[in-house]
Amino acid sequence: MLATGATVSTAGLAQVDREKIYQWINELSSPETRENALLELSKKRESVTDLAPMLWHSCGTIAALLQEIVNIYPSINPPTLTAHQSNRVCNALALLQCVASHVETRSAFLAAHIPLFLYPFLHTVSKTRPFEYLRLTSLGVIGALVKTDEQEVINFLLTTEIIPLCLRIMESGSELSKTVATFILQKILLDDTGLAYICQTYERFSHVAMILGKMVLQLSKEPSARLLKHVVRCYLRLSDNSRAREALRQCLPDQLKDTTFAQVLKDDSTTKRWLAQLVKNLQEGQVTDPRGIPLPTQ
């Protein structure tokens, strides 16, 4: 009897929870009740598997989330964003991330060009905590998109300014923001279209190579195994392109060729393997002249 009662109780609780979800979604439409609804729904986004379709298909909900984003544009420049404003808009961004990563809503999310609403946040440079949290949460939405490995995501992102935005954050952001931005670049590079796009012109490739080189130098002074892993993977993927491979033979940082990172990577067999493969890729196809000088193949 106890077991039966427990089952009924759990089912009843689930129904109550669903009713609360519906109530909070409705409350998003009203400015008076929106802040609490954002907070409660963002807490539930992991446990309610169909929250994304519910948000997308309910009347006025996405418009309300976009209104939350647009409302803080004036606080970006000049940078006056408060912790309270940042927390509130990041709850809205968390719900958009939920929509971005769900298979039923992702295509519509891209078709509506919603990621573009986040780009002004990625342009910010203020180092204060509210801005850092805002940038990191915005990167999380883009990261959720690329994590799906869907071709349509890469095709969409390549029509936008996401690569230069990520490169700027990779150069000057916090370690966590740098890590997510580098992960996004890595995912773009791992797609054949993305690799071809970045290696299409010298300007694009050299910008990426320059920032990665600066990061290696910085990592040699302030090591981060997690960030280094993504940097090495970006380099390895670039070496799959013949033109990029030629250029990398000249500009790959010495720190990736010597023992600078041996201690950082001692327990990371995957990154060590990638690094060894990168060095091997750059050595293959080289011709040595009689004086022992490596010459690039024609």
Swiss-Prot record:
InterPro entries: ARM-like (IPR011989), ARM-type_fold (IPR016024), CNOT9 (IPR007216). GO terms for cellular component: CCR4-NOT complex; CCR4-NOT core complex; nucleus; P-body. Keywords: Activator, Cytoplasm, Nucleus, Repressor, RNA-mediated gene silencing, Transcription, Transcription regulation, Translation regulation. It comes from the Eukaryota. GO terms for molecular function: transcription coactivator activity. It is found in: Nucleus; Cytoplasm, P-body. The keyword Transcription regulation applies. GO terms for biological process: mRNA catabolic process; negative regulation of intracellular estrogen receptor signaling pathway; negative regulation of translation; regulatory ncRNA-mediated gene silencing. Component of the CCR4-NOT complex which is one of the major cellular mRNA deadenylases and is linked to various cellular processes including bulk mRNA degradation, miRNA-mediated repression, translational repression during translational initiation and general transcription regulation. Additional complex functions may be a consequence of its influence on mRNA expression. Involved in down-regulation of MYB- and JUN-dependent transcription. Enhances ligand-dependent transcriptional activity of nuclear hormone receptors. May play a role in cell differentiation. Homodimer. Component of the CCR4-NOT complex. Belongs to the CNOT9 family. This is CCR4-NOT transcription complex subunit 9. It comes from Danio rerio. The lineage of its organism: Eukaryota, Metazoa, Chordata, Craniata, Vertebrata. The gene is cnot9.
